[in-house]
Curated annotation (Swiss-Prot):
Binds 1 Mg(2+) ion per subunit. Belongs to the succinate/malate CoA ligase beta subunit family. This is Succinate--CoA ligase [ADP-forming] subunit beta. Substrate binds at residues 274, 331-333. GO terms for molecular function: ATP binding; magnesium ion binding; succinate-CoA ligase (ADP-forming) activity; succinate-CoA ligase (GDP-forming) activity. ATP binds at residues 46, 53-55, 109, 112, 117. It catalyses: succinate + ATP + CoA = succinyl-CoA + ADP + phosphate; GTP + succinate + CoA = succinyl-CoA + GDP + phosphate. Coiled coil: none annotated. It is an enzyme of class 6 (ligase).
Protein backbone atom coordinates (compact mmCIF):
# COMPACT_ATOMS: atom_id res chain seq x y z
CA UNK A 1 0.00 0.00 0.00
CA UNK A 2 1.28 3.46 -0.95
CA UNK A 3 0.66 6.79 0.77
CA UNK A 4 1.16 10.45 -0.11
CA UNK A 5 4.31 12.43 0.58
CA UNK A 6 2.75 14.51 3.36
CA UNK A 7 1.53 11.34 5.07
CA UNK A 8 4.95 9.71 4.75
CA UNK A 9 6.62 12.71 6.36
CA UNK A 10 4.11 12.69 9.21
CA UNK A 11 4.88 9.01 9.86
CA UNK A 12 8.64 9.65 9.82
CA UNK A 13 8.27 12.67 12.10
CA UNK A 14 6.79 10.34 14.75
CA UNK A 15 10.22 8.70 14.90
CA UNK A 16 12.11 11.98 15.21
CA UNK A 17 13.07 12.42 11.56
CA UNK A 18 13.69 16.07 10.63
CA UNK A 19 11.24 17.19 7.93
CA UNK A 20 10.22 20.68 6.75
CA UNK A 21 7.02 22.15 8.17
CA UNK A 22 4.04 21.78 5.91
CA UNK A 23 0.28 21.31 5.69
CA UNK A 24 -1.93 19.32 3.29
CA UNK A 25 -4.55 21.28 1.37
CA UNK A 26 -7.66 19.92 -0.33
CA UNK A 27 -8.88 23.30 -1.57
CA UNK A 28 -7.51 26.69 -2.58
CA UNK A 29 -8.67 28.19 0.72
CA UNK A 30 -6.83 25.50 2.68
CA UNK A 31 -3.70 26.16 0.61
CA UNK A 32 -3.86 29.86 1.48
CA UNK A 33 -4.41 29.07 5.17
CA UNK A 34 -1.43 26.71 5.12
CA UNK A 35 0.80 29.39 3.59
CA UNK A 36 -0.33 31.92 6.18
CA UNK A 37 0.55 29.48 8.97
CA UNK A 38 4.01 28.88 7.51
CA UNK A 39 4.69 32.57 7.12
CA UNK A 40 7.21 32.34 4.28
CA UNK A 41 9.26 33.86 2.80
CA UNK A 42 9.48 30.85 0.45
CA UNK A 43 6.79 28.22 -0.10
CA UNK A 44 6.73 24.99 -2.08
CA UNK A 45 3.41 23.94 -3.62
CA UNK A 46 3.49 20.18 -4.18
CA UNK A 47 0.99 18.02 -6.05
CA UNK A 48 0.11 14.91 -4.06
CA UNK A 49 -0.27 11.83 -6.26
CA UNK A 50 1.02 8.28 -5.96
CA UNK A 51 3.73 8.69 -8.59
CA UNK A 52 7.23 10.05 -8.92
CA UNK A 53 8.55 12.64 -11.35
CA UNK A 54 6.06 15.28 -10.23
CA UNK A 55 8.46 18.19 -10.60
CA UNK A 56 9.16 17.37 -14.24
CA UNK A 57 5.57 16.40 -14.97
CA UNK A 58 3.10 18.38 -17.07
CA UNK A 59 -0.51 19.30 -16.46
CA UNK A 60 -3.10 18.50 -19.11
CA UNK A 61 -4.76 21.62 -20.47
CA UNK A 62 -1.82 23.91 -19.75
CA UNK A 63 0.68 25.15 -22.28
CA UNK A 64 4.14 23.63 -22.86
CA UNK A 65 5.73 26.42 -20.81
CA UNK A 66 3.63 25.70 -17.72
CA UNK A 67 5.38 24.62 -14.55
CA UNK A 68 5.26 21.03 -13.28
CA UNK A 69 3.72 19.49 -10.19
CA UNK A 70 6.19 20.96 -7.67
CA UNK A 71 6.48 24.75 -7.64
CA UNK A 72 8.54 27.18 -5.56
CA UNK A 73 6.81 30.51 -4.89
CA UNK A 74 7.47 33.56 -2.72
CA UNK A 75 4.10 34.89 -1.59
CA UNK A 76 0.71 33.77 -0.33
CA UNK A 77 -0.87 35.20 -3.48
CA UNK A 78 1.38 32.98 -5.61
CA UNK A 79 0.41 29.98 -3.49
CA UNK A 80 -3.24 30.78 -4.19
CA UNK A 81 -2.70 31.25 -7.94
CA UNK A 82 -0.78 27.99 -8.29
CA UNK A 83 -3.27 26.07 -6.15
CA UNK A 84 -6.09 27.28 -8.41
CA UNK A 85 -4.15 26.07 -11.44
CA UNK A 86 -3.10 22.69 -10.03
CA UNK A 87 -6.07 21.35 -8.05
CA UNK A 88 -8.41 19.22 -10.12
CA UNK A 89 -6.05 18.98 -13.08
CA UNK A 90 -4.48 15.80 -14.42
CA UNK A 91 -0.72 15.58 -13.89
CA UNK A 92 1.23 13.37 -16.30
CA UNK A 93 4.65 12.08 -15.24
CA UNK A 94 6.97 9.34 -16.48
CA UNK A 95 5.48 7.05 -13.82
CA UNK A 96 1.76 7.74 -14.36
CA UNK A 97 1.66 6.80 -18.02
CA UNK A 98 -0.19 8.86 -20.60
CA UNK A 99 -3.43 8.81 -18.59
CA UNK A 100 -1.85 10.75 -15.71
CA UNK A 101 -3.42 11.23 -12.29
CA UNK A 102 -5.81 13.92 -11.09
CA UNK A 103 -4.43 16.16 -8.36
CA UNK A 104 -6.98 16.21 -5.53
CA UNK A 105 -4.70 17.50 -2.79
CA UNK A 106 -1.61 19.66 -2.39
CA UNK A 107 1.13 19.90 0.20
CA UNK A 108 2.16 23.44 1.11
CA UNK A 109 5.63 23.31 2.60
CA UNK A 110 8.21 25.79 3.81
CA UNK A 111 11.11 26.40 1.45
CA UNK A 112 14.60 25.14 2.27
CA UNK A 113 18.10 26.26 1.42
CA UNK A 114 19.78 23.33 -0.33
CA UNK A 115 23.55 22.99 -0.04
CA UNK A 116 23.73 19.32 -1.15
CA UNK A 117 21.32 16.62 -2.28
CA UNK A 118 21.54 12.88 -1.60
CA UNK A 119 19.52 9.74 -2.27
CA UNK A 120 18.69 7.28 0.52
CA UNK A 121 16.33 4.33 0.66
CA UNK A 122 15.54 1.25 2.72
CA UNK A 123 13.92 -1.82 1.22
CA UNK A 124 13.52 -5.52 1.87
CA UNK A 125 16.17 -7.72 0.28
CA UNK A 126 14.08 -10.76 -0.60
CA UNK A 127 17.11 -13.00 -1.13
CA UNK A 128 18.54 -12.52 2.36
CA UNK A 129 15.45 -11.28 4.27
CA UNK A 130 17.61 -8.40 5.51
CA UNK A 131 16.97 -4.68 5.10
CA UNK A 132 19.01 -3.13 2.29
CA UNK A 133 20.20 0.46 2.56
CA UNK A 134 20.83 2.20 -0.77
CA UNK A 135 22.66 5.54 -0.72
CA UNK A 136 24.02 7.88 -3.37
CA UNK A 137 25.54 11.33 -3.60
CA UNK A 138 23.39 11.87 -6.70
CA UNK A 139 20.19 13.07 -5.01
CA UNK A 140 17.29 14.71 -6.77
CA UNK A 141 17.64 12.38 -9.78
CA UNK A 142 15.92 9.14 -10.75
CA UNK A 143 17.99 6.43 -9.10
CA UNK A 144 17.42 4.24 -12.18
CA UNK A 145 19.24 6.82 -14.30
CA UNK A 146 22.11 6.95 -11.81
CA UNK A 147 22.34 3.14 -11.76
CA UNK A 148 22.54 3.10 -15.55
CA UNK A 149 24.93 6.00 -16.11
CA UNK A 150 27.14 5.99 -12.98
CA UNK A 151 26.55 2.80 -10.96
CA UNK A 152 29.73 3.42 -8.98
CA UNK A 153 27.97 6.33 -7.27
CA UNK A 154 25.49 3.98 -5.59
CA UNK A 155 26.46 2.29 -2.32
CA UNK A 156 24.46 -0.59 -0.87
CA UNK A 157 24.75 -2.42 2.43
CA UNK A 158 22.42 -4.59 4.50
CA UNK A 159 21.19 -4.67 8.09
CA UNK A 160 20.38 -7.96 9.82
CA UNK A 161 16.93 -7.62 11.49
CA UNK A 162 18.09 -10.03 14.18
CA UNK A 163 20.69 -7.54 15.44
CA UNK A 164 19.51 -4.18 14.08
CA UNK A 165 21.57 -1.07 13.40
CA UNK A 166 25.13 -0.94 14.73
CA UNK A 167 27.42 2.14 14.86
CA UNK A 168 29.40 0.86 11.88
CA UNK A 169 26.25 1.08 9.73
CA UNK A 170 26.01 4.80 10.51
CA UNK A 171 29.68 5.29 9.67
CA UNK A 172 29.20 3.38 6.43
CA UNK A 173 26.32 5.66 5.43
CA UNK A 174 28.22 8.83 6.32
CA UNK A 175 31.21 7.67 4.27
CA UNK A 176 28.99 6.78 1.30
CA UNK A 177 27.55 10.31 1.32
CA UNK A 178 30.88 12.01 2.03
CA UNK A 179 29.72 13.42 5.36
CA UNK A 180 32.01 14.26 8.27
CA UNK A 181 31.80 15.85 11.71
CA UNK A 182 28.35 16.81 12.90
CA UNK A 183 26.69 15.74 9.65
CA UNK A 184 28.17 12.25 9.99
CA UNK A 185 26.59 11.99 13.45
CA UNK A 186 23.27 13.21 12.05
CA UNK A 187 23.48 10.56 9.31
CA UNK A 188 23.93 7.83 11.91
CA UNK A 189 21.00 9.15 13.95
CA UNK A 190 18.84 9.40 10.83
CA UNK A 191 19.61 5.81 9.85
CA UNK A 192 18.50 4.60 13.28
CA UNK A 193 15.27 6.63 13.03
CA UNK A 194 14.45 5.41 9.53
CA UNK A 195 15.20 1.80 10.41
CA UNK A 196 12.97 2.02 13.49
CA UNK A 197 10.11 3.41 11.37
CA UNK A 198 10.70 0.80 8.66
CA UNK A 199 10.34 -2.11 11.09
CA UNK A 200 7.65 -0.67 13.34
CA UNK A 201 5.30 0.12 10.45
CA UNK A 202 6.07 -2.97 8.32
CA UNK A 203 7.28 -0.94 5.36
CA UNK A 204 8.40 -2.64 2.18
CA UNK A 205 10.12 0.47 0.82
CA UNK A 206 11.18 3.84 2.24
CA UNK A 207 12.72 6.25 -0.27
CA UNK A 208 14.10 9.72 0.46
CA UNK A 209 14.97 11.70 -2.64
CA UNK A 210 16.37 14.12 -1.94
CA UNK A 211 17.89 14.04 1.50
CA UNK A 212 19.49 17.48 1.77
CA UNK A 213 22.13 19.37 3.67
CA UNK A 214 20.52 22.70 4.57
CA UNK A 215 22.14 26.10 4.47
CA UNK A 216 22.76 25.91 8.22
CA UNK A 217 24.50 22.52 7.84
CA UNK A 218 21.86 20.02 8.96
CA UNK A 219 20.29 16.97 7.30
CA UNK A 220 16.65 17.19 6.35
CA UNK A 221 14.24 14.92 4.48
CA UNK A 222 12.91 16.97 1.57
CA UNK A 223 10.82 14.28 -0.12
CA UNK A 224 9.69 10.86 1.07
CA UNK A 225 7.96 7.91 -0.54
CA UNK A 226 6.70 5.00 1.56
CA UNK A 227 5.15 1.65 0.64
CA UNK A 228 3.76 -0.73 3.25
CA UNK A 229 3.54 -4.51 3.20
CA UNK A 230 -0.13 -5.14 2.43
CA UNK A 231 0.04 -8.51 4.19
CA UNK A 232 0.81 -6.73 7.48
CA UNK A 233 -1.94 -4.10 7.34
CA UNK A 234 -4.16 -6.10 9.70
CA UNK A 235 -1.97 -4.93 12.59
CA UNK A 236 -1.72 -1.29 11.52
CA UNK A 237 -5.13 0.38 11.65
CA UNK A 238 -3.38 3.76 11.66
CA UNK A 239 -1.71 2.95 8.35
CA UNK A 240 -4.92 1.64 6.77
CA UNK A 241 -6.56 4.96 7.66
CA UNK A 242 -4.05 6.70 5.36
CA UNK A 243 -5.21 4.79 2.27
CA UNK A 244 -6.37 6.96 -0.62
CA UNK A 245 -8.51 4.76 -2.85
CA UNK A 246 -8.85 7.53 -5.44
CA UNK A 247 -5.19 6.86 -6.30
CA UNK A 248 -5.79 3.16 -6.91
CA UNK A 249 -7.22 1.26 -9.86
CA UNK A 250 -10.93 0.53 -9.12
CA UNK A 251 -10.45 -3.01 -10.42
CA UNK A 252 -7.62 -3.61 -7.95
CA UNK A 253 -9.78 -2.28 -5.12
CA UNK A 254 -12.59 -4.66 -6.10
CA UNK A 255 -10.13 -7.56 -6.33
CA UNK A 256 -8.84 -6.88 -2.82
CA UNK A 257 -12.38 -7.37 -1.46
CA UNK A 258 -12.24 -10.98 -2.64
CA UNK A 259 -8.60 -11.54 -1.66
CA UNK A 260 -7.59 -11.79 -5.32
CA UNK A 261 -4.07 -10.90 -6.41
CA UNK A 262 -4.79 -8.54 -9.32
CA UNK A 263 -2.57 -6.02 -11.06
CA UNK A 264 -3.81 -4.08 -14.08
CA UNK A 265 -1.48 -3.92 -17.10
CA UNK A 266 -1.64 -2.24 -20.50
CA UNK A 267 -2.29 -5.18 -22.81
CA UNK A 268 -5.35 -6.65 -24.50
CA UNK A 269 -5.54 -10.25 -23.26
CA UNK A 270 -7.07 -10.82 -19.84
CA UNK A 271 -5.66 -13.68 -17.77
CA UNK A 272 -7.19 -15.73 -14.97
CA UNK A 273 -4.74 -18.20 -13.46
CA UNK A 274 -4.19 -20.07 -10.19
CA UNK A 275 -0.73 -19.56 -8.71
CA UNK A 276 1.61 -16.59 -9.06
CA UNK A 277 4.30 -18.56 -10.88
CA UNK A 278 1.87 -19.96 -13.44
CA UNK A 279 0.34 -16.50 -13.84
CA UNK A 280 3.74 -15.02 -14.71
CA UNK A 281 4.46 -17.90 -17.09
CA UNK A 282 1.10 -17.29 -18.75
CA UNK A 283 1.90 -13.61 -19.26
CA UNK A 284 5.31 -14.53 -20.68
CA UNK A 285 3.90 -16.94 -23.23
CA UNK A 286 1.26 -14.43 -24.33
CA UNK A 287 4.10 -12.03 -25.08
CA UNK A 288 5.99 -14.84 -26.82
CA UNK A 289 3.09 -15.18 -29.26
CA UNK A 290 3.15 -11.46 -30.00
CA UNK A 291 0.44 -10.04 -27.73
CA UNK A 292 0.37 -8.24 -24.37
CA UNK A 293 -1.34 -9.33 -21.12
CA UNK A 294 -4.01 -6.98 -19.73
CA UNK A 295 -3.52 -8.08 -16.15
CA UNK A 296 -1.92 -10.35 -13.59
CA UNK A 297 -4.65 -12.27 -11.77
CA UNK A 298 -4.03 -15.12 -9.35
CA UNK A 299 -7.24 -16.61 -7.93
CA UNK A 300 -5.24 -18.67 -5.43
CA UNK A 301 -5.48 -22.29 -4.45
CA UNK A 302 -8.75 -22.32 -2.52
CA UNK A 303 -11.03 -20.12 -4.61
CA UNK A 304 -14.79 -20.51 -4.40
CA UNK A 305 -17.30 -20.24 -7.22
CA UNK A 306 -18.13 -16.70 -6.03
CA UNK A 307 -14.46 -15.71 -6.02
CA UNK A 308 -13.94 -17.00 -9.56
CA UNK A 309 -17.08 -15.18 -10.71
CA UNK A 310 -15.77 -11.95 -9.19
CA UNK A 311 -12.40 -12.45 -10.89
CA UNK A 312 -14.05 -12.92 -14.28
CA UNK A 313 -16.16 -9.79 -13.79
CA UNK A 314 -13.06 -7.75 -12.94
CA UNK A 315 -11.33 -8.90 -16.13
CA UNK A 316 -14.33 -8.10 -18.34
CA UNK A 317 -14.70 -4.67 -16.72
CA UNK A 318 -11.46 -3.60 -18.41
CA UNK A 319 -12.39 -1.98 -21.76
CA UNK A 320 -8.94 -2.79 -23.14
CA UNK A 321 -9.51 -6.54 -22.88
CA UNK A 322 -10.06 -8.05 -26.34
CA UNK A 323 -9.80 -11.69 -25.29
CA UNK A 324 -9.53 -13.84 -22.15
CA UNK A 325 -7.29 -16.80 -21.36
CA UNK A 326 -8.22 -18.97 -18.37
CA UNK A 327 -5.28 -21.20 -17.45
CA UNK A 328 -5.86 -23.53 -14.51
CA UNK A 329 -3.69 -26.36 -13.23
CA UNK A 330 -5.87 -27.93 -10.60
CA UNK A 331 -4.16 -29.13 -7.46
CA UNK A 332 -5.87 -27.70 -4.42
CA UNK A 333 -7.93 -25.62 -6.86
CA UNK A 334 -10.53 -27.88 -8.50
CA UNK A 335 -11.23 -27.46 -12.20
CA UNK A 336 -14.99 -27.87 -11.71
CA UNK A 337 -15.05 -24.88 -9.34
CA UNK A 338 -13.29 -22.76 -11.97
CA UNK A 339 -15.71 -23.95 -14.63
CA UNK A 340 -18.77 -23.16 -12.49
CA UNK A 341 -17.42 -19.68 -11.73
CA UNK A 342 -16.67 -18.90 -15.37
CA UNK A 343 -20.09 -20.11 -16.52
CA UNK A 344 -21.87 -18.12 -13.79
CA UNK A 345 -19.94 -14.96 -14.62
CA UNK A 346 -20.50 -15.21 -18.36
CA UNK A 347 -24.23 -15.75 -17.89
CA UNK A 348 -24.36 -12.69 -15.64
CA UNK A 349 -22.21 -10.21 -17.58
CA UNK A 350 -22.23 -11.73 -21.05
CA UNK A 351 -19.29 -12.65 -23.25
CA UNK A 352 -18.32 -10.14 -25.93
CA UNK A 353 -14.72 -11.26 -26.52
CA UNK A 354 -13.06 -14.60 -27.36
CA UNK A 355 -12.54 -16.93 -24.38
CA UNK A 356 -9.95 -19.71 -24.30
CA UNK A 357 -9.96 -22.15 -21.38
CA UNK A 358 -7.16 -24.55 -20.50
CA UNK A 359 -7.94 -26.89 -17.62
CA UNK A 360 -5.70 -29.61 -16.22
CA UNK A 361 -5.56 -31.46 -12.92
CA UNK A 362 -8.13 -32.18 -10.20
CA UNK A 363 -11.64 -32.83 -11.58
CA UNK A 364 -10.56 -31.74 -15.07
CA UNK A 365 -13.10 -33.99 -16.83
CA UNK A 366 -15.93 -32.61 -14.72
CA UNK A 367 -14.74 -29.06 -15.37
CA UNK A 368 -14.66 -29.61 -19.13
CA UNK A 369 -18.11 -31.21 -19.00
CA UNK A 370 -19.56 -28.18 -17.18
CA UNK A 371 -18.18 -25.82 -19.81
CA UNK A 372 -19.17 -28.02 -22.77
CA UNK A 373 -22.75 -28.35 -21.51
CA UNK A 374 -23.08 -24.63 -20.72
CA UNK A 375 -23.71 -23.66 -24.32
CA UNK A 376 -21.03 -20.97 -24.14
CA UNK A 377 -18.81 -20.19 -27.10
CA UNK A 378 -15.57 -21.29 -25.43
CA UNK A 379 -12.38 -22.34 -27.20
CA UNK A 380 -10.76 -25.35 -25.51
CA UNK A 381 -6.97 -25.59 -25.24
CA UNK A 382 -4.88 -28.71 -24.65
CA UNK A 383 -1.94 -27.01 -22.93
CA UNK A 384 -0.51 -23.58 -22.11
CA UNK A 385 1.23 -23.07 -25.44
CA UNK A 386 -1.89 -24.12 -27.33
CA UNK A 387 -4.02 -21.79 -25.20
CA UNK A 388 -1.79 -18.77 -25.75
CA UNK A 389 -1.60 -19.40 -29.48
CA UNK A 390 -5.38 -19.76 -29.77
CA UNK A 391 -6.27 -16.62 -27.78
CA UNK A 392 -3.79 -14.47 -29.69
CA UNK A 393 -5.11 -15.83 -33.00
CA UNK A 394 -8.72 -15.28 -31.90
CA UNK A 395 -8.04 -11.68 -30.85
CA UNK A 396 -6.17 -10.90 -34.06
CA UNK A 397 -8.96 -12.49 -36.10
CA UNK A 398 -11.64 -10.44 -34.34
CA UNK A 399 -9.73 -7.17 -34.79
Amino acid sequence: MNIHEHQAKAVLAEFGVAVPRGYPAFSVDEAVQAAEKLGGPVFVVKSQIHAGGRGKGRFEGLGPDAKGGVRVVKSVDEVKANAEEMLGRVLVTHQTGAAGKQVNRLYIEEGAQIAKEFYLSLLVDRETSWVSVVASTEGGMDIEEVAHATPEKIVTFSIDPATGVFPHHGRHLAKALGLTGGLAKEAATLLNQLYAAFLAKDMSMLEINPLIVTGDDHLRVLDAKVSFDSNALFRHADVVALRDESEEDPKEIEASKYDLSYIALDGEIGCMVNGAGLAMATMDIIKLYGAEPANFLDVGGGASKEKVTAAFKIITADPNVKGILVNIFGGIMRCDIIAEGVVAAVKEVGLKVPLVVRLEGTNVDLGKKIINESGLNVIAANDLSDGAEKIVKAVRGAA
